[in-house]
């Protein structure tokens, strides 16, 4: 993993913005904080985005879970993680208004002036509306509903920041159900993230016609795909994952697929 970047002074902030960090959208966006820039806050990961075509830096298992849920949502067209809240004077004014201490940079030796820390929102989503327009939603990710007082203060600064610029703000709290759904999406889409599109050479309609809504054992589906296309078990499993990940098959993601060995097909492109 690459070395962490230094963001300890106002000059550092200016240089980062000049390098395009924290600005832009889609493939060009660079998160303000990367996995290597922060001390461990859980299971950090870097995941290639199927919609953005860039690496996403996710700082905890709950962030990863939310990312998979958001990416799988057809309305979401862009995901910007670790989004910086600029200008600093606005978050400072909000903190002063609320009589809260603004987050400060810590542990900088030889710096006589206190430096305001750049606050970030875990995710800024761009969504396509039913009418064809765009809207934005800011998401703060939390492990559970029990939030310490200081954390709640920072969340209130964050909420008011987005309110002032007319962007919806929401707190996402991890749950067992969402963890199961996210894990299933992660599994199904993992075969798509290298961009190889290996599935294109197979006439998948031959499979889809056979998959009426029902509950199927994975081993049976894998054997059927192997038989029809003459591929080994690993390739057959990858094709099954691709059909789910590409939403050719609509399956019930609310129970653990790999743990149960079962897939409940709700519908597909032909049924």
Annotate each language-model stretch with its function:
Residues 1-271:
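Electrostatic, structured charged patches in enzyme active sites and in nucleic-acid/phosphate-binding
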């Amino acid at each position: 993993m690459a070395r962490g970047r230094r963001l300890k002074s106002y000059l550092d902030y200016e240089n980062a913005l000049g390098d395009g960090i924290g600005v832009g959208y889609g493939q060009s966006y660079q998160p303000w904080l990367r996995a290597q820039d922060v001390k461990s806050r859980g299971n950090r990961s870097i995941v290639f985005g199927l919609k953005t075509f860039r690496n996403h830096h996710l700082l905890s298992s709950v962030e990863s879970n939310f990312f998979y849920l958001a990416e799988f949502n057809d309305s979401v067209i862009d995901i910007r993680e670790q989004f910086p809240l600029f200008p600093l004077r606005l978050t400072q004014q909000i903190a002063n208004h609320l009589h809260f201490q603004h987050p400060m940079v810590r542990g900088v030796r030889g710096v006589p002036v206190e430096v305001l820390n750049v606050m970030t929102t875990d995710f800024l989503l761009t969504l396509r509306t039913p009418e064809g327009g765009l809207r934005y939603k800011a998401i703060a990710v939390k492990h559970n509903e029990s939030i310490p007082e200081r954390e709640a203060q920072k969340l209130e600064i964050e909420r008011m920041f987005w309110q002032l610029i007319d962007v919806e703000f929401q707190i996402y709290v991890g749950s067992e159900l969402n963890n199961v759904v996210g894990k299933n999406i992660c599994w199904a889409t993992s075969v798509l993230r290298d961009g190889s599109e290996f599935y294109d050479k197979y006439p998948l309609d031959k499979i889809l016609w056979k998959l009426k809504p029902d509950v199927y054992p994975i081993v049976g589906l894998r054997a059927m795909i192997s038989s029809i296309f003459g591929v080994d078990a690993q390739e057959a499993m990858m094709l099954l994952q691709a059909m789910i990940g590409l939403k050719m098959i609509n399956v019930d993601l609310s129970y653990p697929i790999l743990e149960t060995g079962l897939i409940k097909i709700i519908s597909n492109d032909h049924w």
